[in-house]
Amino acid sequence: MELNNETLRMAVKLWLENEKEAIKQYGHISNWNTSNVTDMSKLFHNAKKINNDISNWNTSNVTNMSSMFCNTYTFNQDIGKWNTSNVTGISYMFYNAYNFNQDISNWNTSNVTDMSFMFYYTHAFNQDIGKWNTSNVTDMRSMFYYACKFNQDIGNWNTSNVTNISYMFCNAHVFNQDIGNWLTNNVTDMSHMFHNAYEFNQDIGKWNTSNVTDMSSMFYNAYNFNQDISNWLTNNVTNMYCMFYHACEFNQDIGNWLTNNVTSMSCMFCNACEFNQDISNWNTSNVTNMSRMFYKAHNFDQDISNLKINKIINTHEIISGTRLHIRLDGESCFNKSIMKKLFSYDRRKDFLKFLVESGYIPYQGSCLKDSYHKIFSKEDIYKIIMSFI
């Protein structure tokens, strides 16, 4: 019996509900004739216990396999010989297919355009897919999200048409392969790309980032990353929020980056313990949020007096925990001249707000924040302001 798109779904539904009845009507699932099927998207969606041999299915006319095995927690069958030459969409295909780990290295992916979320939470998967043809793929976001064991060479992939690689290796804890030759000239979103990619430390300094607008959390918790990315073009980037958050080893010269369009640098170097580079030439004229930018970046003590903060509305704890941290007793190594340049005389109220919100006016080891006016008199506050301006 030849099945089409509609009858195949009916057959699968019956198989999951009553296997014996499905065999009576359609035969065993392993022998179904799927030669006329073009759409297998979501075919086994949420079939948590499905794990039958379907290796002989004819998929030569299938164009869509998106979400096919989504949430099939136990599925782990050999489907490596499937004909995928006409498939264009395989996004979410193995989403939450925790146990899937089969050889699909020979799949023809030349017509695939969307690989987003393909191995999302596919914990067991670690197969060689380095020879896949990805020349037509435009979306790879979250492709290996939480693919905890994946660490294969995919350095030769053609990524020339890819526009989105956000979250691609997020939580891919062991991934550490050379992808430095990837063509990224069309990529616009790199946010969270290596978020929690603990082992990744490869040279990606030659990437073309001229069209990227979002680099937020790109190296968040990328503990080992410390590569030269000084030549990246960042003139179109608007979001650098948490970019190097807890990137413990990172300490590279990025002082020549063009940051004129960036609006958020909040938590950018938060907990980046080793970072201590000169960024005094950065153009921060459009930045509105620098809260916790250098929070607990313990080694940072660079002169940032040239940074423009005229549009900044949030400086909460911008350098708290660094060598620049202010103490009321004056025993820190903070350079007062930096603050004098940052805040003009007519902005002394803003300066006080900056001190308080940033935690720079401690009282017996505690940040004053909203309670500062209850501890200091108006005269004391005035003295504090004038001592730095």
Locations of regions flagged by a protein language model:
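Negatively charged
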Residues: 1-389
